[in-house]
Amino acid sequence: MKQAEQKFRTECLAGLRRAQALRPEIIESSARTIEEVLGRYNQLLMAASASNALAGLMSEVHPAEAIRDAARECEQEVSKFYSALALDREMYDALAAVDVSAADADTQRFHAHTLRDYRRAGVDRPLEVRARLENIDEELTKLSQAFSKTISEDVRVIEVDDPARLAGLPADFIASHPAAADGKIRITTDYPDYNPFMTYANDDALREQLYIAFRSRGDGKPHERGAEVDQGNEAVLRDILTLRAEKAGILGYANWADYITADKMIGSGDRAAEFLERVQKLAAPRAQEDYT
């Protein structure tokens, strides 16, 4: 497996290495043109994105734990690169020096939004503040990975005691879930079980049972497969919220909701909360019908 891990790591980091190589080409270029700066910057983003996409996918779906762990390490390296890039003053200055006044609307928009995102990230803050922001982003990446890992590895099971209750499910699904020695059919919260079961099973009670099990993953409470139960995700979530609040405060926002929505159509945390309240009022009557 060591050889497979190394091969995957090399493949996963190929895009990142290309992105890292493009950085000096951009900031050291004497020609501050759209092609030399924005074009290469776009190539840099695409290269890093390729590594990030591969790492994110394989960390969740690869059957080998060693490869999943290698993918998470790759993801951390890409995230570290993104964090440094977002606070890279030399890159910001190179991008800001490009004259896009005669460019098409799409190029002007890309340029304006890129500079805006740099300022939102804190590129104009003192060096020590930027260093703290980078540290926060790195910690948030690790915490988010831990949060996702806890959920993905917390596989729950429901038991079906009568094959007739599998009515509605495709024949191949039923055939792949024979009864065990005790006569019970076991359905897990893994996606190959969960998605078809929730889509096709006629038995409302079983679908409710599986849905609750699926949504309870990572809560740290004992369950059928919970021989070794940790504290779940509560502590991790608290750490994430604490760091998000610190980052928002450093960047001049009252809270994380205001920061994360500032560049969105909704515009602020208060507006987002108002929207959710309106949706809740409209949806509540129909939702209540499901309970009666």
Predicted regions: what is each one?
Residues 1-292:
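Zn2+-dependent metallopeptidase catalytic domains
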